[in-house]
C-alpha cells in the first residue's frame, strides 16, 4: 500500500506556495526514513531466520554485514546520480532550454489526470490529489517535479482539465463563458470552493514559473489533445494572466504553429480579448518590424489570413468607427487591406454594427474613402460596383480631346465619366519603380477601362509628412518588407524620388508614369485616356517631366516610344516661365529670342540611344543653340540647381560660356564634345559623317570630326585648316590695331580743331566787346585825293578731313565817284596758329591787345584742360562739337560781312555808326549778363535740389538709425551666426520671435548691416511659387500704406525663402495676455482738454477715442487690401502688431491674392478654431470681403471689452456659437453705438454686414466737427414743416416707434440735468437773438418760442444754440457780478470752444446723438434731404 506523502508532522499544504527547495528537502527526508525502515525489516527477518534455523553459523552474519555495506555504497552512488540529474534539470530550466523537457514525462502526468473521475474520488481536493500523484513518481520523475513543479503549476493543470468538462450541465448557448460562470458551476462540488477564489487563481496564474510552463506545456502537452479546454481556459481565466504569460502563449503558438492546429486563430482571438496591453502592442506601427524579427504576433497576420474573427478582436468598435470616419489618418490599415486583398475584413467593416450606426446619411463619404483607398493601392477587390458609382463624376479632363467627329458645340460640352479614386501615383514611396505594385496598378487600370471610365489626369501633390512614431516608422517598415528603395544613379537632387520634389514639380498622371519608367503601366494608362476615340492634347504631358526623362543618362526606349505612339513628342522644349523669356530676350540673338525661346530635345539627351530615337522622329541634326541659353533652360527646367552645379559636372562648358563675348551657335556634335560624351559623339559620327568608316570613328580626333561634321552635315563650303584659322586670327588682330590707330588720330585732329575754333571764337568775341567798329576792319589810310584801299582778310578753318583755305576780299572806294569793287585776291594757305594776321598795330590799342592775348591764353589753357578731360568721351560728342564749330564760323562770317557794310556807311556817317555800335555793344553785354544770370540761377536751383535730396536722404537715414537704436535699446542684442544675402540673424532658440505652420520660423535679424528686421524663414516645398508671391507683397506694401506691415526684401537658398519684415514690438494678443493693454492705451493717449467737470467721464471718453483711433488703423489697412481686391482671411489679435504706438496688419499668408502663380500664399486654410471666422469659412463656402468685416467686428469687441470675445471666452464653444448665431454682447450694453456696429459686423448673413465705408461713416467714428454738423442739420430737419408735426416731434421722445407704449428717452426734464446758471443764459441769449432777428426783418417784436423741457427737439435746439453762440453766452456769464468765481471758471471750461461745449452735453446726455441717428434712419423722417449720411 502506498504511503501518503504528507504526514501529520508536516505542515498542511494549504494555499501557501511550495518552492522547489522545500519539495527537495521533504523528498530527502522521506528517502532517509525509507532507508531506516528497510534496515529494521531486514533485522527482524534475520532474527526470525535465526530462530527458525538453529544450525545457522557465524558466516551468514558476516555475509549479511558485507551485503549491508555494499548496499550503503550503492545508495550513495544513487544519491550522487540523483543529485547530478537534479542539478542538470535546474540548469536547463534556468537557461530556458525547453527542449530538455521530457515529452513522455508530461504525458504520464496527463494520463493520470485525464479522467474527470479522479476529481470526484478526492472530492475535488487539489492538495490531496497533488499528494497522491507525487508520492509514487516514475523513475526520475521525482527529480523533475522537485525542481520544476509547484502546487500552482499542478493547480493550473487541473483548471485546464476542468475546463474541458465545463459545458456539461450548463446552458450550451454560452459561447464565451467567464469566471463567474465557471465559479457558479463548480462552487458546490466538494471542497473546490476554497481553491477557486479570485485571489488564489490570480496568485497561481501570475507565478514566475508560468512563463516557462506555458511556453512548453501548453503546446507540447495540452493543445494536441485538449483544444477546447485550452480555449475555454483562456476565455475564463485570461484576465488573470499577466501580459508576460499572454505574450509567451502567443509566441509559442505563433512560432511553432502548424496546419494541424485549426483552432490557432481562436486562441489568439481570446488572448487579444483578455489583455488590453497585448492587443495594443500587436497593432502598433512602431513595433511591427521588431515583433516580426522576433517571430511574434502582429496585425499583419490578421490581414494576411483575411480573418474577420481576429480582426474583430484586434480592432474594437471605437477603432472601427475611427477607421471609417478618418481613413486618411490610418493609411497603414488600408495599405494592408490593399496589399493582402483582405476582402472578408472589408465586408465585416461594412456589416459591423458600429459602421451601420455611423452610416446614417453618410454612406457616400464612407464609400468615397474606401474607393480612394482602393485606388491608392490599386486593389480592385475593394471596389464593388456600388463603390465605383459613388466615385464617378461627369466632368471635363485636362489634356483629353473628344473624338473629332463631334461638332464644335458638342466638343465644348463633352464630359467624361471620370474615376477620381486613383491616387496611388501620389505616394512615390509606394509606387516609384515598384514592380509588384505596378502589376497591381496595370490590372486595376484595365478593369477601370473595361467599365468605360476615364482616369483623372490631374495628380494631386502629396504633403510632406512630419516624421512621427506612427507614420514614419511604418513607412520605413513598408519600404523594407514590401518595397525596395529606388534611387537613380548619377542623378541630381531635384530628381530624387522625394516628397519634396513631388511638391516642387507637380505633374500629370502621364508625366508621373513616364518618370517611373514602367512601360506596361504607361501603355494601359494611355489606352484608358484614348478610349472611345479620344486623343491627347499638348498639356496632357508636363514637358519638364519629359525633359528630365530624356536627360537621364540611362535609356528608357520603351517608355518614350510608347508615349510617342499616343502623344507625339515635339522637337523642341519650351519653357514658359517669364523669367526665362525675359532673360532670353535680353541676352540672345534674334534666332533665340521671343517666340523662338526653345531648345531641341536632342541637346538634352545624354544617352546615344535616346539621341538616336529623337533624331529618328525629328531630323533636326542641323539645329544649333547658344550655350548660355541652354544653361538657363536647364536650370529653369529643374535639371540642375544653379550654374555652379553645371560647371562642376562639365568644365569645358564653363570655359566656353565664359569666353564667349557674343552668342555663338553650337551644333549638336560640338555640344556633345563640350559635355565629353563619347558615346553620343561616336554615334553622331558613325551615323551622319559618311566620309569616315564606322570602325575608324573611335580613332579620329574630335577636332577633325567637328570639321568634317561642318562640311558634310552643316554644309560649310570650305575646309578650314588650322593654319588658315590661325592666319585669320592674325588678320583680325592687325585690323583691330589699325582701327585703334585711326580712332586715336581722329581724336587728336578733332581736339586740335576744337582748340582752333575755341580760340577764334574767343578772339572774335573779345574784339567785339573791347574794340570800336573801326578796329574790326584793317584799313590802309591814303590822302583824300587818292583812293582808299580797305582790305579785309578773313581766314576760315575747315574740318579735319578737308584742306584749309583763306580768302581775302579787297575793295577800293573813291570819295566822289560811286563805289567800285576791286578784284578779289586769293590768299595763300592758312598760316600756323603761332603766326598772327598782318594787321597794323596802331589800329589796335595795346590794352585791348594784351587783354586779348591773356584771354586767348587762358582760354587755350582752359580748352586744353577741357580737351584732356574730354578725351575719354564718345565720337558722338566730337561730331556735335564739329557741327557747333561750323555754325559758329558761318555766323562769324555773316557778322564780318555786315560789319564791313557798316564800316562803309560809318565813313559817311561816323557819328550815327558809333552810336549804333555802342547800342549794339550795350545790348550784347546785357544779353550776356542775362544769360550768365540765368545760368547762375539754374546752377543755384540744381544745387538747391541736390541739397534738398541730400537732406532728405540724411533725414531718412537718421530716422532709420533712431528706429534701429530704439529697437536695439528695447530688444536684446543680436549675435548673428547665419547670413543669407543682406540678412543676418541668429538661429538660436532664444532668437525665435514667432512660429507658423509647415515649419515656418520668425527670427530677429538685421538687414543691410544696420536696420533691425524680422526674418521669416519659410520652406519652398510647401509653395514652389512663393518667391513670385513675395515680390507681389513687396510691391503691394511699398505703396505708402502705413497700416500694413512692410515687406522689405527677400533672399533664398536651396531649401528656404527668407522674407524681411518690419520688426514690431509685440502683437495685440501679447498686450492682452500680459495685461498691459490698458497701460498701453493710456500712455499713447494725448489730449489738450483741461476741464473741471466730470473728469472720469472725460477720461473714459478719451480712452475710448484712443481705442477707436487704433481700430481705424486696422480698418485702413483692410480698406487698402480691399481696394487691391485682396481678402486677408485670417484677421485675429495675433496678426495685429504694435509698431511705433500704432497697429499694423501682418501675416498676409492666407490672403486671396490675384497672382499668376497661385491664389494663396500658403497651402493651409484657416480652421476657425479661434472664433474669428464667420460661418461661411467654417462651411468652406466662397469667401468674400465680408469675411474680414466679421473678423473686424470681433476685434472691435475685443478692443472695447479688454480682451473678451462676442461669442464667448471659451474657445471650444465659440465655433458652436458662431454656427448657431448666439453672440453675447452684454459687455457693450452701455455703449449703444458700439453695440449697434458690432451687431451688424458679426451678422451671420454676410449680406447684412456693412462695408468699410459704411463702418467709417458710423456715428461711433464721428469727429467733433461731424457731430456739430449733425446737430445743426438735425435742427434744420426738425424745422421742416413735414417733420414739425406733433407726431414726429413726439417720436423723438421715445426709444421705440410706439409713443404710447415706448420708454421715454428723458427720465426727467432736461433743464434739471443742465446746470441752472447755464440754462438761464442760454435762454436769455436765445431771446436776444430772436428779438434782433425779428427787428431786422419786420421791425416788430414777435412772440418768442420758449423751450419745452420735456421735448427732445428743444434739447437739440438748445445744444445747437450753445454750440453756435458759446462766446456770447460765456461773455454774458463772465459779466454777471452775482456769480461766484468758481462758477465762472466752470463756465469758462464748458464754453471756451465748440469742442468743450459738445463734450459737456455728451457728459450730460451720452446717448442723445445715437438716439437721433437711429430715429432719423426711420422712414417717417425725410432725413436724406438734410443729412448727408449713408444709413
Swiss-Prot record:
Protein name, as recorded: Probable serine/threonine-protein kinase irlA
Species for this entry: Dictyostelium discoideum (Social amoeba)
Active site: 1130 (proton acceptor)
Gene Ontology cellular-component annotations: IRE1-TRAF2-ASK1 complex
E.C. code: 2.7.11.1
Lineage: Eukaryota, Amoebozoa, Evosea, Eumycetozoa, Dictyostelia
This protein's record includes keyword Transferase: yes
Residue spans of biased composition, Basic residues class: 1-10, 738-749
Gene: irlA
GO biological process, one term: IRE1-mediated unfolded protein response
Coiled-coil annotated spans: 57-97, 715-759, 860-971
Binding site for ATP: 993-1001, 1016
Family per record: Belongs to the protein kinase superfamily. Ser/Thr protein kinase family.
SUPFAM superfamilies linked to this entry: beta-sandwich domain of Sec23/24, Protein kinase-like (PK-like)
Domain of life the protein comes from: Eukaryota
